[in-house]
Amino acid sequence: MLERIGISLEDGLLEQFDKLIAEKGYVNRSEAIRDLIRDALVQRAFTESSGREERVAVVTLVYDHDSSSLAQKLAHIQHENHRAVVSALHVHMDPHNCLEVLVLRGRGKDVVAMGESLVATKGVKYGKLVPATAGHDLG
């Protein structure tokens, strides 16, 4: 069942939102707002969980592979937590930069700790931990 609701937004914010949803290919505002709500609920489930529930997340890292100590540090963190690493993808972006995408699975607090450790490693140019969900509780 769907419920209709109303929201109030400043003109400038609505204009930016409409531009964003058009760029992303949403057919209407409702779909975009539902996705924003789902994302917020997934984030909350990850941060508010007791840490015992099994969670899945994706970690994205970009770094300069010429920094051998950095590559070794990242590999060391992964090997220390090898049971949590479900999959790893390594892409050579250009002659110097590498993209690494890791799928992690385990207790929520362990997944978050490992992901944050990788992202915070000195020398990582870009890093992001993205929680994933099967969506059972999202309606």
From Swiss-Prot:
InterPro entries listed in its UniProt record: Acetolactate_synth/TF_NikR_C, ACT-like_dom_sf, Arc_rbn_hlx_hlx, CopG, CopG/NikR_regulator, Ni_resp_reg_NikR, Ribbon_hlx_hlx, TF_NikR_Ni-bd_C
GO molecular function: DNA binding; DNA-binding transcription factor activity; nickel cation binding
Superkingdom of this protein's organism: Bacteria
Keyword tags: DNA-binding, Metal-binding, Nickel, Transcription, Transcription regulation
Cofactor-binding details, from the entry: Binds 1 nickel ion per subunit.
Co-factor(s): Ni(2+)
Protein's UniProt keywords contain Amino-acid biosynthesis: no
Binding-site list for Ni(2+): H79, H90, H92, C98
Tagged with keyword Transmembrane helix: no
Any one Gene Ontology BP term: response to nickel cation
Residues that span the membrane, as ranges: none
One Pfam family linked to the record: RHH_1
Matches recorded under HAMAP family: NikR
Family: Belongs to the transcriptional regulatory CopG/NikR family.
NCBIfam families per record: PRK00630.1, PRK01002.1, PRK02967.1, PRK04460.1
Protein role: Transcriptional regulator.
Descriptive protein name: Putative nickel-responsive regulator
Gene source species: Anaeromyxobacter sp. (strain K)
